């Protein structure tokens, strides 16, 4: 098995691999600051702690496309970004974690395009940073 977005295999369909950043998904989300009251006639503050809420997590994954040629790269590139920028939350499956994460696309940058020789075959290899916002996945 491998990592997927919306049940689509990243490697098989898009020639994509997540190089780094998976470990950031394991961090527990930051707690939202609870409502508080600062009474003039009491020390400190009074906090509303009956319900706990969490912030979204902004995660940057370093990704890499590998394609047979430039036409193949552009097809995979356009198909991938069309999929992850659809309305609503998308689902990222990380095989190493055996876990789904709901997310939406924020940005992609730091593209590095190179032509590599792998076993005497030309391949297009493009690394980039993908930033997504993860919906808190807490019990």
List PLM regions with ranges.
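Extracellular/virion structural assembly segments
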Residues: 1-139
């Amino acid at each position: 098995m491998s990592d997927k977005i919306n049940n689509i295999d990243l490697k098989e369909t898009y020639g994509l691999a997540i190089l780094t950043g998976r470990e950031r998904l394991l961090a527990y989300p930051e707690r939202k600051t609870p409502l508080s009251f600062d009474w003039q006639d009491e020390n400190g503050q009074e906090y509303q702690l009956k319900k706990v809420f969490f912030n979204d997590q902004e995660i940057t994954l370093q990704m890499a496309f590998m394609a047979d040629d430039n036409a193949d790269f552009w097809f995979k590139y356009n198909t991938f970004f069309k999929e992850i920028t659809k309305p609503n939350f998308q689902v990222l499956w990380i095989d190493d974690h055996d876990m789904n994460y709901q997310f939406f696309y924020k940005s992609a940058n730091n593209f590095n395009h190179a032509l590599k020789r792998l076993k005497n075959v030309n391949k297009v290899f493009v690394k980039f940073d993908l930033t997504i916002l993860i919906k808190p996945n807490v019990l």
